[in-house]
């Protein structure tokens, strides 16, 4: 499915032409922990809404030579902007964002996907993490001074 058409006649020798589809795919980062995490061999894509499971499989196997085992798709409804959020009886929809199509692509068993690191960690972020760790340590030391103060029976009785 392409919007480009081949011309009937072109000057010169006949040439092979490849027409790629007008579809697009984008890798979506999924959480590595928690209930929404995906298996290691699964990749989450946001795809063109016109794409079918077969289109996604062919796109990844033919163009990128990936070992696709299974494709599952999901259509997520776009957010609706209401004129009045609290008035449930008379509210009207003012705007609706476009729906998204999400594809979960499962690769063969040995394949592992990790989301690429696009940017290096900033020094400010590293300093912030270091300060947070230091704050936790100080909090623990402060709590140790006050923990179980009323249970110093040994000191009280002279033992």
Swiss-Prot record:
MF (Gene Ontology): structural constituent of ribosome
Pfam short name (any one): Ribosomal_L23
Residue ranges of coiled coil: none
InterPro entries found in the cross-reference section: Nucleotide-bd_a/b_plait_sf, Ribosomal_uL23-like, Ribosomal_uL23/eL15/eS24_sf
Record GO cellular component, one term: mitochondrial large ribosomal subunit
Primary site of residence: mitochondrion
Keyword line: Mitochondrion, Ribonucleoprotein, Ribosomal protein
Subcellular localization: Mitochondrion
GO biological process: one example: mitochondrial translation
Subunit relationships: Component of the mitochondrial ribosome large subunit (39S) which comprises a 16S rRNA and about 50 distinct proteins.
Protein family according to the UniProt entry: Belongs to the universal ribosomal protein uL23 family.
Protein name in UniProt: Large ribosomal subunit protein uL23m
